[in-house]
Swiss-Prot record:
Example GO BP: photosynthesis, light reaction
GO cellular component: chloroplast thylakoid membrane
Topology in the lipid bilayer: Peripheral membrane protein
Keyword Thylakoid tagged: yes
Entry-linked InterPro entries: NADH_DH_suC, NADH_quin_OxRdtase_su_C/D-like, NADH_UbQ_OxRdtase_30kDa_su, NADH_UbQ_OxRdtase_CS
UniProt keyword Transmembrane helix, yes or no: no
Subunit organization: NDH is composed of at least 16 different subunits, 5 of which are encoded in the nucleus.
Key words of the record: Chloroplast, Membrane, NAD, NADP, Plastid, Plastoquinone, Quinone, Thylakoid, Translocase, Transport
Organism name: Panax ginseng (Korean ginseng)
Protein name (database record): NAD(P)H-quinone oxidoreductase subunit J, chloroplastic
Function: NDH shuttles electrons from NAD(P)H:plastoquinone, via FMN and iron-sulfur (Fe-S) centers, to quinones in the photosynthetic chain and possibly in a chloroplast respiratory chain. The immediate electron acceptor for the enzyme in this species is believed to be plastoquinone. Couples the redox reaction to proton translocation, and thus conserves the redox energy in a proton gradient.
Length: 158
C-alpha cells in the first residue's frame, strides 16, 4: 500500500521504495544512499522541518547496516503533524551515507553515535568522530559480528 508521501515522490520522479506503515500508521520509505541527500533537502522544503530522531542498526550478521530517520512536518494550526520514517541501507564493507547535518542540525550527535557504535561513515558531517567510545577503541560495538576485547572491569567490592 502506497502512502501519501510515496505517491508525491513518485509524481515528482524521486526514486524510493515504500516499506508500508508501522504499527502507528507512520509511512516508512527506503531511500538509496546516493539519493538520500537530495531527497532530504526536498523533504525539508516540502515541510518536514523537524528531525525527531536518527538511529542505526545492524540488520543481520554480515548483512546491511541501516540508518533510520524519523521526520515530522510541523505546521501552525495542525493538531496531528504528518510523520515519516526513512530507512537508508548501506553495505557493511563500506557503509557510507551522506550526512544530513546541513539540512537538520539536530542530527549532529545522533549521526556521530551511529558512526561510533556501528561504523557508518556520514560523508560531509563536519565533526564525525567517536562520541561515546575512546578514540583508540578498535571496532564497532553494536555490530552483530563484533567480538568484544578480552579484558575484565575492576569493580569496587563495597
Amino acid at each position: 500500500m502506497q502512502g501519501r508521501l510515496s505517491a508525491w515522490l513518485v509524481k515528482h520522479g524521486l526514486i524510493h521504495r515504500s516499506l508500508g506503515f508501522d504499527y502507528q500508521g507512520i509511512e516508512t520509505l527506503q531511500i538509496k544512499p546516493e539519493d538520500w541527500h537530495s531527497i532530504a533537502v526536498i523533504l525539508y522544503v516540502y515541510g518536514y522541518n523537524y528531525l525527531r530522531s536518527q538511529c542505526a542498526y545492524d540488520v543481520a550478521p554480515g548483512g546491511l547496516l541501516a540508518s533510520v530517520y524519523h521526520l515530522t512536518r510541523i505546521e501552525y494550526g495542525v493538531d496531528q503533524p504528518e510523520e515519516v520514517c526513512i530507512k537508508v541501507f548501506a553495505p557493511r564493507r563500506n557503509p557510507r551515507i551522506p550526512s544530513v547535518f546541513w539540512v537538520w542540525k539536530s542530527v549532529d550527535f545522533q549521526e556521530r553515535e551511529s558512526y561510533d557504535m556501528l561504523g557508518i561513515f556520514y560523508a560531509t558531517h563536519p565533526r564525525l568522530k567517536r562520541i561515546l567510545m575512546p578514540e583508540s577503541w578498535v571496532g564497532w560495538p553494536l555490530r552483530k559480528d563484533y567480538i568484544a576485547p578480552n579484558f575484565y572491569e575492576i569493580q569496587d567490592a563495597h
